Amino acid sequence: MIETDRYDPRLDRDALKEIFEDFIENKSYFISTWKEFEKELNKRVLDLQYRNSMIIAKEEGVIVGWGTYTLIKDYLGNNRALIHQVLTKREDSYRKGIEEQIIRELKLYIKRTLNLDKVFIICQDSDSALRNLVMKLGAKKSKNYWYENDI
Protein backbone atom coordinates (compact mmCIF):
# COMPACT_ATOMS: atom_id res chain seq x y z
CA MET A 1 0.00 0.00 0.00
CA ILE A 2 1.28 3.45 -0.92
CA GLU A 3 1.42 6.07 1.85
CA THR A 4 2.30 9.75 1.49
CA ASP A 5 4.44 11.77 3.87
CA ARG A 6 6.52 14.95 3.96
CA TYR A 7 10.07 14.90 2.59
CA ASP A 8 12.74 14.79 5.31
CA PRO A 9 16.12 15.92 3.92
CA ARG A 10 18.08 14.06 6.59
CA LEU A 11 16.41 10.70 6.02
CA ASP A 12 15.21 10.76 2.42
CA ARG A 13 18.02 12.38 0.39
CA ASP A 14 19.79 9.18 -0.77
CA ALA A 15 16.54 7.50 -1.83
CA LEU A 16 15.47 10.66 -3.66
CA LYS A 17 18.81 10.80 -5.48
CA GLU A 18 18.26 7.26 -6.75
CA ILE A 19 14.75 8.10 -7.95
CA PHE A 20 15.93 11.37 -9.54
CA GLU A 21 18.70 9.65 -11.51
CA ASP A 22 16.33 6.97 -12.82
CA PHE A 23 13.72 9.59 -13.71
CA ILE A 24 16.19 11.80 -15.62
CA GLU A 25 17.59 8.79 -17.47
CA ASN A 26 14.14 7.64 -18.62
CA LYS A 27 12.36 10.95 -19.28
CA SER A 28 14.24 12.31 -22.27
CA TYR A 29 12.42 15.65 -22.24
CA PHE A 30 13.86 16.59 -18.82
CA ILE A 31 17.48 17.71 -18.67
CA SER A 32 19.14 18.23 -15.30
CA THR A 33 21.83 16.89 -13.01
CA TRP A 34 21.69 15.78 -9.40
CA LYS A 35 23.93 18.74 -8.48
CA GLU A 36 21.45 21.26 -9.98
CA PHE A 37 18.46 19.48 -8.48
CA GLU A 38 20.10 19.21 -5.05
CA LYS A 39 20.91 22.94 -5.09
CA GLU A 40 17.22 23.76 -5.68
CA LEU A 41 16.17 21.14 -3.14
CA ASN A 42 18.40 22.74 -0.49
CA LYS A 43 16.81 26.16 -1.14
CA ARG A 44 13.33 24.69 -0.79
CA VAL A 45 14.22 22.94 2.47
CA LEU A 46 15.00 26.34 4.03
CA ASP A 47 11.60 27.78 3.01
CA LEU A 48 8.91 26.35 5.32
CA GLN A 49 6.16 26.70 2.70
CA TYR A 50 8.12 24.68 0.14
CA ARG A 51 9.59 22.25 2.67
CA ASN A 52 6.12 21.21 3.79
CA SER A 53 4.96 20.85 0.20
CA MET A 54 7.57 18.27 -0.83
CA ILE A 55 5.60 15.03 -0.76
CA ILE A 56 7.06 11.54 -0.85
CA ALA A 57 5.26 8.27 -1.48
CA LYS A 58 6.39 5.18 0.39
CA GLU A 59 5.66 1.53 -0.17
CA GLU A 60 6.56 -0.71 2.77
CA GLY A 61 8.83 2.05 4.11
CA VAL A 62 10.71 2.51 0.82
CA ILE A 63 10.42 5.82 -1.05
CA VAL A 64 8.90 5.25 -4.50
CA GLY A 65 7.93 8.80 -5.52
CA TRP A 66 8.44 12.52 -4.86
CA GLY A 67 6.50 15.60 -5.92
CA THR A 68 6.26 19.33 -5.34
CA TYR A 69 4.96 22.56 -6.82
CA THR A 70 6.24 26.05 -7.52
CA LEU A 71 4.34 29.18 -6.59
CA ILE A 72 4.53 31.86 -9.27
CA LYS A 73 3.33 35.42 -8.78
CA ASP A 74 2.69 37.09 -12.13
CA TYR A 75 3.09 40.78 -12.90
CA LEU A 76 -0.57 41.41 -12.04
CA GLY A 77 -0.09 40.05 -8.53
CA ASN A 78 -1.89 36.75 -9.16
CA ASN A 79 -0.52 33.67 -7.41
CA ARG A 80 -0.38 30.53 -9.51
CA ALA A 81 0.59 27.09 -8.26
CA LEU A 82 2.37 24.89 -10.77
CA ILE A 83 2.55 21.18 -9.92
CA HIS A 84 5.61 19.53 -11.41
CA GLN A 85 5.80 16.02 -12.81
CA VAL A 86 6.14 13.48 -10.03
CA LEU A 87 9.51 11.71 -9.83
CA THR A 88 9.30 7.92 -9.86
CA LYS A 89 11.44 5.08 -11.07
CA ARG A 90 10.55 3.76 -14.48
CA GLU A 91 9.34 0.38 -13.17
CA ASP A 92 6.92 2.09 -10.75
CA SER A 93 5.68 4.75 -13.17
CA TYR A 94 1.85 4.84 -13.40
CA ARG A 95 1.49 1.26 -12.15
CA LYS A 96 0.85 1.81 -8.47
CA GLY A 97 -1.02 5.11 -8.38
CA ILE A 98 2.01 6.95 -6.99
CA GLU A 99 1.63 9.99 -9.22
CA GLU A 100 -2.10 10.28 -8.57
CA GLN A 101 -1.71 10.07 -4.80
CA ILE A 102 1.06 12.69 -4.70
CA ILE A 103 -0.80 15.08 -7.02
CA ARG A 104 -3.97 14.75 -4.93
CA GLU A 105 -1.98 15.47 -1.76
CA LEU A 106 -0.34 18.52 -3.38
CA LYS A 107 -3.72 19.85 -4.56
CA LEU A 108 -5.11 19.50 -1.04
CA TYR A 109 -2.06 21.27 0.44
CA ILE A 110 -2.34 24.12 -2.08
CA LYS A 111 -6.06 24.56 -1.44
CA ARG A 112 -5.76 24.52 2.36
CA THR A 113 -2.49 26.39 2.81
CA LEU A 114 -2.41 28.87 -0.07
CA ASN A 115 -6.19 29.26 -0.42
CA LEU A 116 -5.97 28.86 -4.19
CA ASP A 117 -8.79 27.21 -6.09
CA LYS A 118 -6.84 26.40 -9.25
CA VAL A 119 -3.57 24.62 -9.98
CA PHE A 120 -1.59 24.14 -13.15
CA ILE A 121 0.02 20.78 -13.89
CA ILE A 122 3.00 20.43 -16.21
CA CYS A 123 2.27 17.73 -18.77
CA GLN A 124 4.18 17.01 -21.96
CA ASP A 125 1.92 16.26 -24.93
CA SER A 126 4.13 13.24 -25.66
CA ASP A 127 3.46 11.71 -22.20
CA SER A 128 0.13 10.00 -22.74
CA ALA A 129 0.17 8.23 -19.35
CA LEU A 130 0.46 11.54 -17.48
CA ARG A 131 -2.08 13.20 -19.77
CA ASN A 132 -4.56 10.39 -19.00
CA LEU A 133 -3.96 10.84 -15.26
CA VAL A 134 -4.37 14.61 -15.51
CA MET A 135 -7.70 14.16 -17.32
CA LYS A 136 -8.77 11.53 -14.73
CA LEU A 137 -8.14 14.17 -12.06
CA GLY A 138 -10.51 16.51 -13.92
CA ALA A 139 -7.91 18.89 -15.36
CA LYS A 140 -8.35 20.42 -18.79
CA LYS A 141 -5.86 21.92 -21.20
CA SER A 142 -5.24 25.48 -20.06
CA LYS A 143 -6.08 28.49 -22.16
CA ASN A 144 -2.83 29.99 -20.86
CA TYR A 145 -0.27 29.04 -23.46
CA TRP A 146 3.41 29.05 -22.66
CA TYR A 147 5.89 29.23 -25.48
CA GLU A 148 9.58 28.52 -25.29
CA ASN A 149 12.37 30.28 -27.13
CA ASP A 150 16.12 29.72 -27.03
CA ILE A 151 18.11 32.93 -26.55
Give short role names for the model-derived ranges:
Residues 1-2:
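Extreme N-terminal starter segment of soluble prokaryotic enzymes
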Residues 86-89, 123:
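Hydrophobic adenine-recognition pocket in adenosine-nucleotide-binding enzymes
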Residues 88, 94-108, 132, 136:
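Conserved acetyl-CoA-binding loop-helix of GNAT-fold acetyltransferases
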Residues 116-117, 140:
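Short acidic/polar active-site loop segments enriched in Thr and Asp
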Residues 119-131:
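Conserved beta-strand-loop-alpha-helix junction that forms the acyl-donor binding cleft
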Residues 122-123, 135-151:
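Conserved catalytic-core motifs of GNAT/GCN5-like acyltransferases
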